[in-house]
Amino acid sequence: MNSEQVTLVGQVFESYVSEYHKNDILLILKERDEDAHYPLVVNAMTLFETNMEIGDYFTVFPNEVLTVFDSALRRSALAVLQSLPEPEGLSMKQNLHARISGLPVCPELVREHIPKTKDVGHFLSVTGTVIRTSLVKVLEFERDYMCNKCKYVFTVKADFEQYYTFSRPSSCPSSDTCDSSKFTCLSDLSASPARCRDYQEIKIQEQVQRLSVGSIPRSMKVILEDDLVDSCKSGDDLTIYGVVMQRWKPFQRDMRCEVEIVLKANYVQVNNEQSSGMVMDEDARKEFEDFWEHYKSDPFAGRNEILASLCPQVFGMYLVKLAVAMVLAGGIQRTDAAGTRVRGESHLLLVGDPGTGKSQFLKYAAKITPRSVLTTGIGSTSAGLTVTAVKDSGEWNLEAGALVLADAGLCCIDEFNSLKEHDRTSIHEAMEQQTISVAKAGLVCKLNTRTTILAATNPKGQYDPQESVSVNIALGSPLLSRFDLILVLLDTRNEDWDRIISSFILENKGYPSKSENLWSMEKMKTYFCLIRNLHPTLSDVSNQVLLRYYQMQRQSDSRNAARTTIRLLESLIRLAEAHARLMFRSTVTLEDAITVVSVMESSMQGGALLGGVNALHTSFPESPRAQYRRQCELILEKLELQSLLQEELRRLERLQNESDQCQPHSPEVEAAPGSCRNDPRDRPGLRTPTQQEQSCSWSPAESSGGDSPTGPGLSRPTSCNHKAEDGGGRGDCLAWADPTASPEIAQESTIVSPGLKTMEEKEDLKISNNGAQGKGKHGLQKRSQLLKPGRLPASGATDTSLRSRGSESTRARQAAVVSEAGRDDDQESGPRRLPRLLKEGSQSVCTTRVRTLPPTVPFPLSISPPGPGKKTGTPKRKRQKSAQVEAPGPEGTETMSAPVVKLAKFTFKQKSKLTHSPEGQGPMPPSASKVAVDSSKIPRQRTRREAGVPAAGPGQSTSTSGDRCSEQLQGQTKALSRQPPESHRPREEKEQGPERRVIQSELELGSQAGHSHPACKKDRKEGASCSNKSKVHAGTMARLANFSFTSPPESKSESLPPERKESRDRSHNPPATTAPVLGQQRQSFQLQQPPERVNLSTLSLFTLSELDDEALDFDWDEEMRKKP
């Protein structure tokens, strides 16, 4: 730059500072220390707008322009001082520095990566994280030399490019003709403080979250001088404005010159407080406020939409997503009057089998958190997690580890159990006190680690629910107690869960699509940064619930003494505040407290009220409001807070009424074909299906390849509710026996008018039996709910179903025994083999004993209202099956012939059986039973499997005989309908308990021969009584440990309906199987409850993925059968 340009730049900058920064200059002049260095921060955008020519000079000649700025600033300060009339208390400062910030956002000036060689000499803004800070040194930047010949004194400045070394002058620079080359250094005798400055080197690293996948973060050194020294520490996020320069060490002969690129800082901006790195404008805030205004009547539906967008590549796992979202939202850090700081960050530990999606949650959380570090336990040491002492250039420096780098952010540690024992103890202080104290290599300091830790680990071998978490994952109690939540994900062997998960994965692989209802990752990042600025306060109601729950945990007999300390109450408060943030609220309400207690109960820290739950199979609730109501009833009753419960129920009723008035919706109106009554789109205030829901939706063309027979006017429903989305759940620890879940089922129960016997009936009988048997163990539990008091289905349908179920169960055992004797094939597992044996046994008996009826003309199913007080509407899966079999197609013949092919493997030997025929009835059909027990005891057996079957109309039955029912059986059934069923009810109810023990003993005796056979184990498991004193083989416990069935109360409501309805319905509906007379009820089989040592509750706080008839909008068995 020439003198004119320097003068222009100086004048423009001096006038700019005098106009815009006069107050800042006055504050500097008031300071008492005249030798200190004072910065004046100038915004580059405002300066360049004043004069664009300065911007051009600044970009081309940054070092010269910065020197001119400092000189102009001193002149401006002197002018301001002189302009004051009474400059009392003001003094002129010589060490003033202009600090440039706020560069225009463009690739030429703002960088997120380390600069390269082409950037040397340019003024840039670089963002990074401090990983190392050196000690502050004293730098001599100039010296005075005197010529020995002419005594001329001149100044020599240190060369920055050669590590601030001084080069002795080669000749005298005086204007006189002096050729002397000998000089004397005057600074050796007394180095003036004015010729020295503070000097510090730091090392910054690229931010990992801003890099592409697989990139290794690079680092570079930054030179800090004067007032910039000690402006940052290890782990800080910085935006550094400076000039990119290169430097090398002095040349040596036969040595390579090593040049490095450094950044000479002009201004350092610490971004820890505003670590989000994004600007929160009013438009974004308004968008989220409108979102919550839309879900004002049902805020949990809005929260679930956010949770569905959290890690969408993982299917279901509602509870885990809720816990991760609460941990990311974070609590509020408090500092009391004494200075004690209580952490606000929550810690989460995911314990689960391999392949349960733990690492996916860690990766997603690290992506949406602006300041995050992702590491693994096997590759981390104590120093790598905390801080490392590194010797560089002959001195020791501290290099920050993962926890320090994640200060005010998130630290994800995968394979947490791989940490060595002495490395685990090093993070105790970091997790609780939020600091790290270091005394290494003579360096003693304390660093902040205000970070949220999200860890994942595998259990040590097979997870044993009988042992504590500390034993299962081999972690000490002091470390586990620092985690606010510990969720267990058990990969139970569940066929339906595996089918849905594989279908979801394969569908996404073949047809990748992006749902419009899911939030993008940028939107999620913006939302979580926004809600961290909220500071919700606890209400009196929430305080009462949290305090009462803490007291219940302390008084629990099975409490963990290391866990139920005051840390538990602090964890509850943090999580409640986090949930209030997630719900975009400024007050912690009762809803937040109830949700936090529910999540805590489902984690391994809780369990004092209802026991734990397998978080893997929790599903998104179809009705979030109904789930919250159920949680309120369960928790507040356990906590004995009846007044709060009544008040909250009244509030929920008021909200429900308001939403119904805004959008009237009748749940009793039958859904139109092709839709689902429980579809979330039809509910007021509920969200539309997300990508995971749409991935479950099956249309007839997609599922059956166009071969599915559909009747006129009926089409297969293609919607999918959230239970179906989240899969299997039949391997869950808790039984789905919550009574609050039954009204939904009762609404969908139907009564089909007894019409003509059509081909649809017969086809449907066969198909529905296959589907019912394919459901396996789950069907028993769901059917037991259907017959609770006040929820009995139609009498005729019940009678037919009872008789067919009884004969089916007896023949199922017959088929299993015969197949065990005639065939020793152990290649099929028990859970897959039992449904096939049940099906083939019943088919074999019917096909060998029953004549084939002539086909009749198909008629459409007619649905007539049964009378007042009855609700109409067919359940979803029943309507689907009816729609499938209305028009018999080629599949019908193939399905009928399939049992014949399977039957070729087995040989059934019919034996003579004991029969019992009441008065006025013909002989019992010869295919009634194969178990030769006392005939006086068998008719009175009526166990849960017979009593718990759902209503079976023309659209669903449990027999495979179909169109092979004989006319002789029809006559027997008509005669049977005249027999009153009440004659056997008193004895049946009295002797039900003793008879179950008789059956159990007989089954144990009959199965001793094939003790090791898988099918025999499965049969004994099916045939065991529900008594808690029963002994189950150890092999079967591995499959049934996660099931829990509760038998319904034995009352008259479970008995058969009155005689009039029974006889009227039976006169129109012939039995679908070789059913015996009513009085001769046969023994049936049911699954056994887990032993008492597994302390699991039958009530669930969260929606478990139970694939019942109403939850699934499609039948997996039917779909798999139709595919070639």
From Swiss-Prot:
Annotated region (Disordered), positions in chain: 657-737, 768-1091
Name the residue ranges with Pro residues bias. Answer: 855-868
Q: Which GO terms describe its cellular component?
A: chromosome; MCM8-MCM9 complex; nucleus
As its record notes, the protein acts as a catalyst of: ATP + H2O = ADP + phosphate + H(+)
Q: Which Pfam families match?
A: MCM, MCM_lid, MCM_OB
Single GO BP term: gamete generation
List, as start-end ranges, the regions of compositional bias called Low complexity: 1080-1089
User: Which branch of life, at top level?
Assistant: Eukaryota
Q: Kindly indicate where the leader peptide sits in this chain.
A: none
What molecular function terms (GO) are annotated for this protein?
A: ATP binding; ATP hydrolysis activity; chromatin binding; DNA binding; DNA helicase activity; enzyme binding; MutLbeta complex binding; MutSalpha complex binding
| Subcellular localization | Nucleus; Chromosome
Q: Where is the composition biased (Polar residues)?
A: 688-707, 955-976
Protein name (record): DNA helicase MCM9
Q: Which organism is it from?
A: Rattus norvegicus (Rat)
Question: Which gene is annotated as encoding this protein in its UniProt record?
Answer: Mcm9
